[in-house]
């Protein structure tokens, strides 16, 4: 990325010396005022502030960070391409919780967008630059470099979702917030069993994410002897859910229930079932995961699904990070939190 | 926002001296390597890099910026609450264009989210901290403080949409990218006139945004003698469009066409027309603005609308900013760009 020419005279920023000169005070006094220091008489404070405003003086960033180590900013990093972040309501709900809770702490939310994992070099440079006090990272994949980048630059971080690689035995666990993926999935499948369904399929998420693996485990907890052909893998998108549903109907035309690992895939599955003339829930009962109200309440029929408190989890991540930044326990000692899930009954199952 | 206790020994970052000592080189040599400088023999470069990795050394941010004044990062600031940014496809399209083009320049997109205009103090502090090389700002409102904040901290900036307050006569104009709001609106209304429609209503956007005002002007250009009761104000949301349509039908039950200032409001208007049993386009013809494909192609009937190249405008904003950062003309001299619009014919008019 190009920068301005170094000798560009029009781009020279005013110095603290210029502020002091304009205010008619010593450099030390000007410095104390700029750094919010006490011990300066009020009229002098006002003179200096006026000079700062007049000159458009910008305090030296690093000098301030050395004193307080506070940028008043927290990075949010999501390992998904920008278009998924804006099309999957899961991310907007989580960001909503984070944004609202950061406001409470008067901290600026800095969302670092990437086009793909290849862009993490750039994210690493930004984190290395010391522009943020901490980070919240989510949607990690198994082969994700982010935890090692974060560890290398010693950025206090809380993860959303259990990270896939806990690291070598010598490395401490990473602090995270996650919902009870396994327990919630098991509850969904038990509900389908209780309705008398016998051929219960599962549309799983991508196997490089722990949330998908844990939900498969919950499905298997209830159906340990289930036919492996009743399990198809989607990618947490509407289209992925539709593709998986098509495969499942080809392999098992007699299936009578589907548990999809998120609501987006459930809505894709629902479309395929409707196109094939399968009545939901009469012929095929369907349960999703997430309880994204913007999806689950508008599908026809509305979706029975496993609710997780996505916004609340975002808020919790912020509070954990703030405790860490407050010096209350290192990240290494910060306890991870698993939040409960709850089956929400609607018409689809 | 709380920071770690200053004397927290576990939080001490490794110094350049420690890197030099571990690598067995002088501090000057270590500094040259860290700053990417030439003139250091390759084996020494490798020794220093190894020490940097081992210690997790983070280069002093300000020292680097003083040399190059490049953070490799650009802020994107949108004066809308976070929930609107994630629910209005206009913003995701613009961010998509910006994200892709910034990738070309290997610059990190830093999206600064706010809950409301009250949060601009915090954004100002972040900009003042010198964490970004420049900014892209959009969705400004008339009373927006953002331009004055940006001017004060001398952050090179390109605006998306013509800013509402060009500033005092002594202040130079702000560089912006916008579409031909007025010309596009006039084309939409001329199309409705050409279909023989005589009572053409307009659902306008909020009057504190120039895009809304310019589209009203385009409507008036074609219908200078139109009944003022045929104009209702929405807020660029689906619900706002529905409310405005309800008002218009109460005031003018005989209206035979509607031009809505964006597609979201057009889809809300369409819902109300359907609920009232008005056939579109037979009884009421409807034209939107934006051509958000995710809306205009899925409404029933599909929406005739004024297309603006939102993603392309985002890309253009990045290229203009990069020219500025390259020293090719100051912001004051950078020419603003108005991009053309085009009427896209679908079934609704």
Briefly describe each language-model feature range.
Chain A
Residues 251-349:
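Flexible loop/turn connectors
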Residues 1-72:
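N-terminal helix-turn-helix DNA-binding module of bacterial transcription factors
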Residues 29, 69-84, 191, 199-205:
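Short beta-strand segments enriched in small/hydrophobic residues
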Residues 1-11, 73-190, 250:
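Alpha-helical recognition/docking segments in bacterial nutrient-uptake
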Residues 80-93, 111-119, 176-187, 203-246, ...:
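Hinge/beta->alpha junction and helix N-cap segments in small-molecule ligand-binding domains
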Residues 199-200, 226-229, 280-286:
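Short acidic capping loops at alpha-helix termini that bridge into adjacent secondary structure
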């Amino acid at each position: 990325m190009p920068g301005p020419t170094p000798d560009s005279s029009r781009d020279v920023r005013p110095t603290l010396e210029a502020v002091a000169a304009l205010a008619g005070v010593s450099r030390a006094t000007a410095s104390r005022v700029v750094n919010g220091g006490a011990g300066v008489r009020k009229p002098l404070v006002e003179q200096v502030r006026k000079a700062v405003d007049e000159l458009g003086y910008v305090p030296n960033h690093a000098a301030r960070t050395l004193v307080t180590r506070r940028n008043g900013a927290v990075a949010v990093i999501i390992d998904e391409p920008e278009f998924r972040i804006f099309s999957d309501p899961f991310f907007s709900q989580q960001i909503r919780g984070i944004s609202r809770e950061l406001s409470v702490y008067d901290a600026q939310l800095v969302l670092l967008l990437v086009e793909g994992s290849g862009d993490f070099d750039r994210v690493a440079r930004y984190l290395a630059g010391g522009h943020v006090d901490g980070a919240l990272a989510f949607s990690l994949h198994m082969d994700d470099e982010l935890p090692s980048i974060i560890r290398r630059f010693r950025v206090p971080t809380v993860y959303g979702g259990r990270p896939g690689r806990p690291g070598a035995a010598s490395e401490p666990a990473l602090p995270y917030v996650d919902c009870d993926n396994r327990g919630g999935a098991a509850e969904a499948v038990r509900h389908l069993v209780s309705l008398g369904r016998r051929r219960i399929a599962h549309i799983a998420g991508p196997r490089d994410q722990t949330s998908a693996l844990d939900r498969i485990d919950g499905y298997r907890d209830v159906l340990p002897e289930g036919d492996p052909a009743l399990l198809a893998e989607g990618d947490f998108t509407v289209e992925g859910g539709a593709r998986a549903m098509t495969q499942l109907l080809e392999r098992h035309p007699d299936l009578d229930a589907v548990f999809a690992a998120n609501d987006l895939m459930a809505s894709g599955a629902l479309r395929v079932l409707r196109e094939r003339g399968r009545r939901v829930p009469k012929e095929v009962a369907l349960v999703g995961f997430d309880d994204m109200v913007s999806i689950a309440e508008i599908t026809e029929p509305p979706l029975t699904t496993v609710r997780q408190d996505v916004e609340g989890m975002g808020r919790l991540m912020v509070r954990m990070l703030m405790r860490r930044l407050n010096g209350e326990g290192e990240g290494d000692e910060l306890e991870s939190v698993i939040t409960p899930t709850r089956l929400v009954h609607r018409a689809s199952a």
